[in-house]
Amino acid sequence: MEELQGYLEKDGSRQQNFLYPLIFQEYIYTLAHDHGLNSSIFYEPMEIVGLGYDNKSSSVLVKRLITRMYQQNSLIYSMNDFNQNLFVGHNNSFYSHFYSQMVSEGFAVIVEIPFSLRLVPSSEEIPKSQNLRSIHSIFPFLEDKLSHLNYVLDILIPYPIHLEILVQILQCWIQDVPSLHFLRFFLHEFHNWNNFLTPTKSISVFSKENKRLFRILYNSYVSEYEFVFFFLRKQSYYLRSTSSGAFLERTHFYVKIEHLIDVCHNHFQKILWFFKDSFMHYVRYKGKAILASRGTYLLIKKWKCYLVNFWQYYFHFWSKPYRIHINPFSNYSFYFLGYISSVLINPSAVKNQMLENFYLVDTLTQKFDTIVPVIPLIGSLSKAKFCTILGHPISKPIWAELSDSDIIDRFGRICRNLSHYHSGSSKKQSLYRIKYILRLSCARTLARKHKSTVRNLLQRLGSGLLEEFFTEEEQVISPIFPKTTLFPLHGSHRERIWYLDIIRINDLANYLDWS
């Protein structure tokens, strides 16, 4: 444990000072407001509790919020006095919700600074990679590695029950005591109002207004767990390690780090000897992780027991064992990054000849396969109000006030992004149903705007109005390969294509990961 403590203390970049004064800077809230407008492909105007506001009025409210924070001397030093609340003491629900949302978003921008600085290369070293690193690059890795493994641990990363655990973990990254007190005060107040957490069984579902702050806290918790977990694993291997770090929703700070692990000959090898497995791979996105191994069932079961005890003794909360499932790759499919992935076994017969004798040899080959999860996608379309839970298209009332070109552009952009992101599916025909839902939802939205029916609208404007929904994937989304033909490539619906320009998961698939 002494080496573990030294490993934690050696990383001096984990701590930053003097973040608290930034809470009183107006430009912080401007950055948070701009991020909220431009972070989604749906791009819906930001509204608070059903009331709209423009940029000028929001700027005035931000200045008023900063003034109130300056005047509240008891904000940090009188934590026990909750009768006078800075954010919800106002009689108008609009102001209370606006203040709470802006403080949450502004503090999230501030807390991102230590994480961002860790990913900015120093002036002495030369950056080895550029910003862009496609999410699709993980799938060729899985295709190359997982087809040769035996077992997989499908892990739902447990969440701390008490919010104080998240604050204590963040304390490892930030030494600014006033900022931590401010965060503790803010979380405690929201927890009392039952407003910060939605009334669900999982802490991982936060209200829409405060989701960004939660992602900061959750990401710091996951980073801490992986920081210690990988240290223990690295102590028992003479292997070259390549690690890639990317802060959630901050892909522009992506940096690839390569280093050679120094193996220590000490008691760690005696403790971890039964975990040695040179064919183990770990992949995580948000709250879901995959730990795959070529070892035996006994070895993978030991890893499960170790993870449960690790969360219990290091983070001081109980991790339910049923959140970690052990499954053989031969008959198991798992959902990851918007795809349903599995390892298929393909039998084949090979004809051999020796002199005048012929004989057949039956062989089994394993192939990593990815398909589009149609039913979950329909569920996310239903949550986004494009269709019913059964998949029947409906109009989008919030977009009915836009111009016809804007409505068509938004629906078409969503459709193209889905085709782009799911280009790695081996069965692209399943996307036709999703395109049909979006196309008819667009038509009904236009009909709602013009107070007409879909049939009359198409007769008046022409069926070519929605022709871009039928545009083949190869004609629209290829920024790498030039468009050389007007006809789709033969058999392209069966070919898997991984693109190098996808820096974020599709929003519809993203809904599934956070639901």
UniProtKB/Swiss-Prot annotation:
Entry GO CC: chloroplast
Disulphide-bridged cysteine pairs: none
Record organism: Trillium undulatum (Painted trillium)
Gene Ontology BP annotations: mRNA processing; RNA splicing; tRNA processing
The keyword Chloroplast is assigned to this record: yes
Coiled coil regions, renumbered to chain: none
Family listed: Belongs to the intron maturase 2 family. MatK subfamily.
Pfam families given in the database record: Intron_maturas2, MatK_N
Top-level taxon in the UniProt lineage: Eukaryota
Function text: Usually encoded in the trnK tRNA gene intron. Probably assists in splicing its own and other chloroplast group II introns.
Keywords: Chloroplast, mRNA processing, Plastid, RNA-binding, tRNA processing
Single GO molecular function: RNA binding
Protein name: Maturase K
Location relative to the cell: Plastid, Chloroplast
